[in-house]
Amino acid sequence: MALWGGRFTQAADQRFKQFNDSLRFDYRLAEQDIVGSVAWSKALVTVGVLTAEEQAQLEEALNVLLEDVRARPQQILESDAEDIHSWVEGKLIDKVGQLGKKLHTGRSRNDQVATDLKLWCKDTVSELLTANRQLQSALVETAQNNQDAVMPGYTHLQRAQPVTFAHWCLAYVEMLARDESRLQDALKRLDVSPLGCGALAGTAYEIDREQLAGWLGFASATRNSLDSVSDRDHVLELLSAAAIGMVHLSRFAEDLIFFNTGEAGFVELSDRVTSGSSLMPQKKNPDALELIRGKCGRVQGALTGMMMTLKGLPLAYNKDMQEDKEGLFDALDTWLDCLHMAALVLDGIQVKRPRCQEAAQQGYANATELADYLVAKGVPFREAHHIVGEAVVEAIRQGKPLEDLPLDELQKFSPVIDEDVYPILSLQSCLDKRAAKGGVSPQQVAQAIAFAQARLE
């Protein structure tokens, strides 16, 4: 059933209908459309369009339809309705007859779809926040279990300074906490109801839009009808949050893919999140992580696509805005799936402590400690940096770690070096000295774990 037609003397070309119809993707707004219609029916009672008895009849029919949709959502796609609004209204008329045709009084599909989409966004943000916090908790638990797993930290993919696997986990907890904050912040701005704004100029009925917003669970009603039906900032904000969040998950995946390689060998992934090769029997491929990394691109694309769609649109509603849904649905679905998958990867991951320790002892990751030692002896840092660089070259030439160079050889580079240098070059000393807030010392890592646990309770 089309919601328009009196103005037209010819039926739409079937090819145009297929091009124009949106039911194949906006069917996902069915529950929100029904909930919004119930609230609108209540508002129509307050302005005398519906009697209380008529409203009760409509609400009962809409609630039956809601349960039917939840039980068998696939029925929607069996229809040739133009969009979810047409489908819901058609089903309502099937149930209550002519009374169903009164429901759309004073309402436009413009404010209707804007309301539906905001309700869907609120529901989905709630799911994303839950999944985000679950992944944070999984990372904190993994950190707690691996506080003593010393491994190399990297810059430029070159071994730089020793860290712990726990410290690495906590870095991603910080990223996810910012993602959580972005979602909560976006939720505040989208939590305003556009229902009652009509096509663009507002409704002609003196409906209390604040009361209507409250019935739908919104914090308040929007202030400008023209903006309300044109606004898709919340779509951009959520796509932006998803794009940033997926960058974090992609980096997480890339790190673990590297840690899992035979060349690094720091971790072993569970069989539950890996797959084999159709040809090479020995292979155990990190497919879950590679898919997380790969799916990042499609989310970035959704954000870019939506910004390009909106950038040249005049006020108010334009059909271009129908393009807001597919990219948003896919991006937030993808982000949610990847959050769940990242948590599953951590469930069963094995950290290979001996190999991590061995790698941390290689690559002259304690060179900075030797420079700091020289500074403590009164050598300016820039000079100390040069001295240690020369010492590293000699250690490489001999195929030894710095701590294995005899004292007399170290003293060739600086006479201030003494026997007390050797304890400072140990891995544990490297960690212990990083005791400022946010550092990798065992005390700081333990405090960070406790803080994260308290925040996530």
From Swiss-Prot:
The EC number(s) given in the record are: 4.3.2.1
Asked if the record carries the keyword Amino-acid biosynthesis, the reply is: yes
The parts of the chain that form a coiled coil are: none
Q: One of this protein's GO BP terms?
A: L-arginine biosynthetic process
Q: Which InterPro entries does this UniProt record tie to the protein?
A: Arg_succ_lyase_C, Argininosuccinate_lyase, Fumarase/histidase_N, Fumarate_lyase_CS, Fumarate_lyase_fam, Fumarate_lyase_N, L-Aspartase-like
Write out the catalysed reaction: 2-(N(omega)-L-arginino)succinate = fumarate + L-arginine
Instruction: Specify where it is mainly localized.
Output: cytoplasm
Q: Which of UniProt's keywords are assigned here?
A: Amino-acid biosynthesis, Arginine biosynthesis, Cytoplasm, Lyase
TM regions (residue ranges):
none
GO terms for MF = argininosuccinate lyase activity
> What pathway does this protein act in?
Amino-acid biosynthesis; L-arginine biosynthesis; L-arginine from L-ornithine and carbamoyl phosphate: step 3/3
GO-annotated cellular components: cytosol
Concerning SUPFAM superfamilies, the annotation shows: L-aspartase-like
The highest taxon in the source lineage is: Bacteria
The protein's matches in HAMAP family, at most eight in alphabetical order, are given as: Arg_succ_lyase
Name used for this protein in its record: Argininosuccinate lyase
